[in-house]
Amino acid sequence: MKAHYKTFVVTACMLLMLGFGLLYSTRKTLNVSAAATGGITGTIKLDGTPPHQKPIDMSKEPNCAKAHASNPVTTETVIVGPKGGLKWVVVYISEGLDAAAASQVPPVKPTWDQKGCQYIPHVMSLDVNQHFEVSNSDPHSHNIHPLPKPNGPNHEWNRSQPPGTPPFDQVWAGEEIAIPVKCNIHPWMHGYMAVVKGPTAVTDENGSYTLNVPPGNYTVTAWQETYGAQSQKVTVAAGKPATADFTYKAK
Protein backbone atom coordinates (compact mmCIF):
# COMPACT_ATOMS: atom_id res chain seq x y z
CA MET A 1 0.00 0.00 0.00
CA LYS A 2 2.81 2.39 1.01
CA ALA A 3 4.69 1.55 -2.17
CA HIS A 4 1.65 2.42 -4.30
CA TYR A 5 1.16 5.67 -2.37
CA LYS A 6 4.81 6.60 -2.82
CA THR A 7 4.61 5.90 -6.55
CA PHE A 8 1.47 8.04 -6.78
CA VAL A 9 3.11 10.98 -5.00
CA VAL A 10 6.22 10.82 -7.18
CA THR A 11 4.14 10.65 -10.36
CA ALA A 12 1.97 13.56 -9.23
CA CYS A 13 5.01 15.69 -8.47
CA MET A 14 6.53 14.93 -11.85
CA LEU A 15 3.31 15.86 -13.64
CA LEU A 16 3.06 19.07 -11.62
CA MET A 17 6.64 20.03 -12.48
CA LEU A 18 6.02 19.22 -16.14
CA GLY A 19 2.92 21.41 -16.10
CA PHE A 20 4.82 24.36 -14.62
CA GLY A 21 7.58 23.82 -17.17
CA LEU A 22 5.13 23.91 -20.06
CA LEU A 23 3.43 26.98 -18.63
CA TYR A 24 6.76 28.78 -18.28
CA SER A 25 7.79 27.73 -21.78
CA THR A 26 4.47 28.92 -23.23
CA ARG A 27 4.64 32.24 -21.40
CA LYS A 28 8.23 32.71 -22.51
CA THR A 29 7.27 32.01 -26.12
CA LEU A 30 4.34 34.42 -25.91
CA ASN A 31 6.55 37.12 -24.42
CA VAL A 32 9.17 36.64 -27.13
CA SER A 33 6.51 36.75 -29.84
CA ALA A 34 4.98 39.90 -28.39
CA ALA A 35 8.38 41.56 -28.16
CA ALA A 36 9.19 40.63 -31.74
CA THR A 37 6.09 42.20 -33.24
CA GLY A 38 6.20 45.62 -34.79
CA GLY A 39 4.71 47.50 -37.66
CA ILE A 40 4.48 50.72 -39.62
CA THR A 41 1.27 52.69 -39.96
CA GLY A 42 0.59 55.98 -41.61
CA THR A 43 -1.68 58.29 -43.54
CA ILE A 44 -1.07 59.76 -46.97
CA LYS A 45 -2.69 63.09 -47.77
CA LEU A 46 -2.92 65.62 -50.57
CA ASP A 47 -2.08 69.25 -49.84
CA GLY A 48 -4.14 71.47 -52.10
CA THR A 49 -7.07 71.13 -54.46
CA PRO A 50 -7.22 67.75 -56.19
CA PRO A 51 -7.46 67.74 -59.97
CA HIS A 52 -10.92 67.32 -61.44
CA GLN A 53 -11.73 63.71 -62.31
CA LYS A 54 -13.26 63.40 -65.76
CA PRO A 55 -16.57 61.59 -66.28
CA ILE A 56 -16.31 58.38 -68.28
CA ASP A 57 -18.59 57.82 -71.27
CA MET A 58 -19.61 54.15 -71.30
CA SER A 59 -22.33 54.49 -73.93
CA LYS A 60 -20.48 52.07 -76.24
CA GLU A 61 -21.10 49.33 -73.66
CA PRO A 62 -24.83 49.60 -72.76
CA ASN A 63 -24.64 47.09 -69.90
CA CYS A 64 -22.05 49.19 -68.09
CA ALA A 65 -23.75 52.49 -68.88
CA LYS A 66 -26.95 51.12 -67.35
CA ALA A 67 -25.14 49.78 -64.28
CA HIS A 68 -23.74 53.24 -63.53
CA ALA A 69 -26.79 55.28 -64.56
CA SER A 70 -27.49 56.53 -61.02
CA ASN A 71 -23.82 56.96 -60.08
CA PRO A 72 -21.71 58.00 -63.08
CA VAL A 73 -18.11 56.81 -63.08
CA THR A 74 -15.12 59.13 -63.26
CA THR A 75 -11.41 58.59 -63.70
CA GLU A 76 -9.48 57.56 -60.57
CA THR A 77 -6.08 59.15 -61.08
CA VAL A 78 -6.35 61.20 -57.85
CA ILE A 79 -8.99 60.18 -55.31
CA VAL A 80 -9.16 62.18 -52.08
CA GLY A 81 -11.39 61.28 -49.14
CA PRO A 82 -13.41 63.72 -47.00
CA LYS A 83 -10.49 64.18 -44.57
CA GLY A 84 -7.87 64.72 -47.25
CA GLY A 85 -6.64 61.13 -47.35
CA LEU A 86 -5.27 59.98 -50.68
CA LYS A 87 -6.61 56.65 -51.95
CA TRP A 88 -4.88 54.12 -54.22
CA VAL A 89 -1.33 54.86 -53.06
CA VAL A 90 1.07 51.89 -53.02
CA VAL A 91 3.25 51.68 -49.90
CA TYR A 92 6.14 49.24 -49.50
CA ILE A 93 9.54 48.67 -47.89
CA SER A 94 12.25 49.71 -50.34
CA GLU A 95 15.22 49.16 -47.98
CA GLY A 96 15.91 47.30 -44.76
CA LEU A 97 14.34 43.87 -45.24
CA ASP A 98 16.55 40.85 -44.77
CA ALA A 99 16.70 38.21 -47.50
CA ALA A 100 14.19 35.92 -45.80
CA ALA A 101 11.57 38.65 -45.34
CA ALA A 102 12.07 39.98 -48.86
CA SER A 103 11.63 36.55 -50.44
CA GLN A 104 8.59 35.51 -48.42
CA VAL A 105 5.49 35.18 -50.61
CA PRO A 106 2.07 35.67 -48.96
CA PRO A 107 -0.29 32.68 -49.27
CA VAL A 108 -3.19 34.98 -50.12
CA LYS A 109 -4.27 35.05 -53.77
CA PRO A 110 -5.75 38.48 -54.58
CA THR A 111 -8.34 38.99 -57.32
CA TRP A 112 -8.22 41.49 -60.16
CA ASP A 113 -11.83 41.77 -61.26
CA GLN A 114 -13.52 43.38 -64.25
CA LYS A 115 -16.86 44.69 -63.07
CA GLY A 116 -19.02 47.47 -64.45
CA CYS A 117 -16.34 48.12 -67.04
CA GLN A 118 -13.88 49.02 -64.31
CA TYR A 119 -10.86 47.28 -62.84
CA ILE A 120 -11.56 46.33 -59.24
CA PRO A 121 -9.35 47.34 -57.53
CA HIS A 122 -8.01 50.26 -59.50
CA VAL A 123 -4.56 49.67 -57.97
CA MET A 124 -3.29 46.35 -56.62
CA SER A 125 0.02 45.61 -54.90
CA LEU A 126 1.46 42.13 -54.60
CA ASP A 127 4.73 40.31 -54.12
CA VAL A 128 7.06 38.87 -56.71
CA ASN A 129 5.92 35.29 -57.46
CA GLN A 130 2.60 35.85 -55.67
CA HIS A 131 -0.21 34.31 -57.69
CA PHE A 132 -3.36 36.32 -58.40
CA GLU A 133 -6.64 35.65 -60.18
CA VAL A 134 -8.19 37.60 -63.02
CA SER A 135 -11.98 37.40 -63.12
CA ASN A 136 -14.79 38.85 -65.23
CA SER A 137 -17.99 39.71 -63.37
CA ASP A 138 -19.60 41.45 -66.36
CA PRO A 139 -22.10 39.92 -68.81
CA HIS A 140 -19.81 40.72 -71.75
CA SER A 141 -16.24 40.11 -72.81
CA HIS A 142 -13.19 41.96 -71.57
CA ASN A 143 -9.58 42.04 -72.63
CA ILE A 144 -6.87 42.44 -70.01
CA HIS A 145 -3.58 43.80 -71.30
CA PRO A 146 -0.78 44.58 -68.79
CA LEU A 147 2.14 46.58 -70.17
CA PRO A 148 5.32 45.96 -68.14
CA LYS A 149 8.56 47.67 -69.11
CA PRO A 150 10.26 46.18 -72.20
CA ASN A 151 13.28 43.96 -71.56
CA GLY A 152 12.44 43.69 -67.88
CA PRO A 153 11.73 40.62 -65.74
CA ASN A 154 8.01 40.73 -66.52
CA HIS A 155 6.49 39.93 -69.87
CA GLU A 156 3.56 41.61 -71.58
CA TRP A 157 0.47 39.51 -72.12
CA ASN A 158 -2.90 40.14 -73.69
CA ARG A 159 -5.84 37.88 -72.92
CA SER A 160 -9.55 38.01 -73.64
CA GLN A 161 -12.05 36.81 -71.07
CA PRO A 162 -15.62 36.08 -72.23
CA PRO A 163 -18.51 36.31 -69.76
CA GLY A 164 -19.06 33.29 -67.54
CA THR A 165 -15.55 31.92 -67.95
CA PRO A 166 -13.69 30.93 -64.78
CA PRO A 167 -10.93 33.13 -63.35
CA PHE A 168 -7.42 32.48 -64.62
CA ASP A 169 -4.18 32.49 -62.66
CA GLN A 170 -1.22 34.81 -63.24
CA VAL A 171 2.05 35.73 -61.54
CA TRP A 172 4.78 38.36 -61.98
CA ALA A 173 8.46 37.36 -61.94
CA GLY A 174 10.12 40.61 -60.86
CA GLU A 175 9.72 43.92 -59.06
CA GLU A 176 8.04 46.71 -61.01
CA ILE A 177 6.22 49.78 -59.76
CA ALA A 178 3.91 49.92 -61.37
CA ILE A 179 2.61 47.93 -64.34
CA PRO A 180 -0.15 49.78 -66.23
CA VAL A 181 -3.11 47.67 -67.31
CA LYS A 182 -5.60 48.46 -70.05
CA CYS A 183 -8.53 46.84 -71.84
CA ASN A 184 -8.36 46.84 -75.63
CA ILE A 185 -12.15 46.52 -75.88
CA HIS A 186 -13.01 49.35 -73.47
CA PRO A 187 -10.36 52.10 -73.81
CA TRP A 188 -11.44 53.90 -70.63
CA MET A 189 -10.47 50.95 -68.43
CA HIS A 190 -7.13 51.59 -66.73
CA GLY A 191 -5.41 50.29 -63.61
CA TYR A 192 -2.03 49.45 -62.08
CA MET A 193 -0.34 46.43 -60.55
CA ALA A 194 2.63 47.15 -58.29
CA VAL A 195 5.01 44.23 -57.79
CA VAL A 196 7.39 44.39 -54.83
CA LYS A 197 9.40 42.20 -52.47
CA GLY A 198 8.13 42.11 -48.90
CA PRO A 199 5.20 43.72 -47.07
CA THR A 200 3.07 46.08 -49.14
CA ALA A 201 -0.27 47.87 -48.92
CA VAL A 202 -2.56 50.17 -50.87
CA THR A 203 -4.16 53.09 -49.04
CA ASP A 204 -7.90 53.10 -48.39
CA GLU A 205 -10.35 56.01 -48.77
CA ASN A 206 -8.87 57.61 -45.63
CA GLY A 207 -5.34 57.42 -46.99
CA SER A 208 -4.41 54.90 -44.30
CA TYR A 209 -2.12 51.89 -44.53
CA THR A 210 -0.36 49.31 -42.34
CA LEU A 211 2.81 47.33 -43.01
CA ASN A 212 3.60 44.38 -40.75
CA VAL A 213 7.36 44.14 -40.28
CA PRO A 214 9.73 42.96 -37.53
CA PRO A 215 11.77 45.49 -35.53
CA GLY A 216 14.47 47.20 -37.56
CA ASN A 217 15.46 50.21 -39.65
CA TYR A 218 13.58 50.65 -42.92
CA THR A 219 12.99 52.95 -45.84
CA VAL A 220 9.28 53.25 -46.60
CA THR A 221 8.29 54.33 -50.10
CA ALA A 222 4.92 55.56 -51.31
CA TRP A 223 3.95 55.62 -55.00
CA GLN A 224 0.98 57.39 -56.57
CA GLU A 225 0.16 57.19 -60.26
CA THR A 226 0.02 60.99 -60.78
CA TYR A 227 2.49 62.29 -58.20
CA GLY A 228 5.16 59.59 -58.24
CA ALA A 229 7.25 58.30 -55.33
CA GLN A 230 8.29 59.61 -51.92
CA SER A 231 10.46 57.87 -49.32
CA GLN A 232 11.37 58.25 -45.67
CA LYS A 233 13.36 56.29 -43.10
CA VAL A 234 11.72 54.83 -40.00
CA THR A 235 12.81 52.72 -37.04
CA VAL A 236 10.50 50.02 -35.71
CA ALA A 237 11.12 49.05 -32.08
CA ALA A 238 9.95 45.79 -30.52
CA GLY A 239 6.28 46.07 -29.62
CA LYS A 240 6.12 49.73 -30.70
CA PRO A 241 4.68 50.46 -34.15
CA ALA A 242 6.29 53.31 -36.07
CA THR A 243 4.52 56.02 -38.04
CA ALA A 244 5.35 57.17 -41.56
CA ASP A 245 3.02 59.82 -42.97
CA PHE A 246 3.35 61.30 -46.45
CA THR A 247 1.98 64.46 -48.05
CA TYR A 248 1.79 65.12 -51.78
CA LYS A 249 1.45 68.61 -53.22
CA ALA A 250 -1.49 69.01 -55.57
CA LYS A 251 -0.68 70.04 -59.10
Summary of predicted features, one role per range:
Residues 11-21:
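Bacterial N-terminal signal peptides
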